[in-house]
């Protein structure tokens, strides 16, 4: 088990794994923190992340079993201790890991007597078993057991219905494609008054097909993919093709206008006005904050060349900043 002391950054937004352990092959646990966050942000991120962790991450399951010797789901087979229904439930619990797209076939072909476990499943190279010891059936007599399996990668869950019984010898299996067993978030506040900030604690339990850290990365990518269209909407709605006629703000204009603004304002006043008191968009605010620009004085003493080196910062943001500063 890995466990670390929680150290909170006072400036740059950071995430960290503070605890990680494997309770068994099919139960992993991870605890993460994200800080510092402004009041209200931790709950927003925590709720969104939990929903994505539990509903959007893909998993791999056995979704169908087929055997010529099985008359119906609730029958028993001579020489097998478990009923057909129990065998199907055991197959449902098998935890798989894969980079599969769509479906594939697998096979169980065993001669008794003996125990049939997950390691007896013949799989394609793209699929692997997390726990080879998972029990499937007990053969009490020297019989041949042959079961064809269908394996699928998807998300959420798939509950069988009467309509899914298409073949008399083919039995659909309830599939739960969610590799994250549970996810919780909690919030700790610190600071006073307007300086109050939050720490987000995120706990993740997985079934072993991926680690909590991998689950967190996948959930983050899923959320990013959801929001990217909003970032592109402004460009796509412009009437000009490829936006080839966008006007950029010359560097010398930026410097000249900043110099005039600085002369008009007292240095003490500028140092006491924080950027979060201005009408900047959250994206611009976060970009500036990550670059240790906290007050208007810091901003007015930053060259445009340096601003444009900030990750995700654009020339349109410079125009917006100039417009805001001229109102001060």
UniProtKB/Swiss-Prot annotation:
EC numbers, comma separated: 2.7.7.6
Region (Alpha C-terminal domain (alpha-CTD)): 268-328
Task of the protein: DNA-dependent RNA polymerase catalyzes the transcription of DNA into RNA using the four ribonucleoside triphosphates as substrates.
Gene Ontology MF terms: DNA binding; DNA-directed RNA polymerase activity; protein dimerization activity
A biological process from GO: DNA-templated transcription
Cellular component terms per the entry's GO annotation: chloroplast; DNA-directed RNA polymerase complex; mitochondrion
Record's catalysed reaction(s): RNA(n) + a ribonucleoside 5'-triphosphate = RNA(n+1) + diphosphate
Compartment list: Plastid, Chloroplast
Protein name listed in UniProt: DNA-directed RNA polymerase subunit alpha
Gene3D superfamilies in the cross-refs: 5' to 3' exonuclease, C-terminal subdomain (1.10.150.20), DNA-directed RNA polymerase, insert domain (2.170.120.12), RNA polymerase, RBP11-like subunit (3.30.1360.10)
Similarity field: Belongs to the RNA polymerase alpha chain family.
UniProt domain comment: The N-terminal domain is essential for RNAP assembly and basal transcription, whereas the C-terminal domain is involved in interaction with transcriptional regulators and with upstream promoter elements.
Coiled coil: none
Region ranges (Alpha N-terminal domain (alpha-NTD)): 1-234
Source species of the chain: Citrus sinensis
Keywords recorded for this protein, A-Z: Chloroplast, DNA-directed RNA polymerase, Nucleotidyltransferase, Plastid, Transcription, Transferase
UniProt keyword Repressor, yes or no: no
SUBUNIT field: In plastids the minimal PEP RNA polymerase catalytic core is composed of four subunits: alpha, beta, beta', and beta''. When a (nuclear-encoded) sigma factor is associated with the core the holoenzyme is formed, which can initiate transcription.
Lineage of origin: Eukaryota, Viridiplantae, Streptophyta, Embryophyta, Tracheophyta
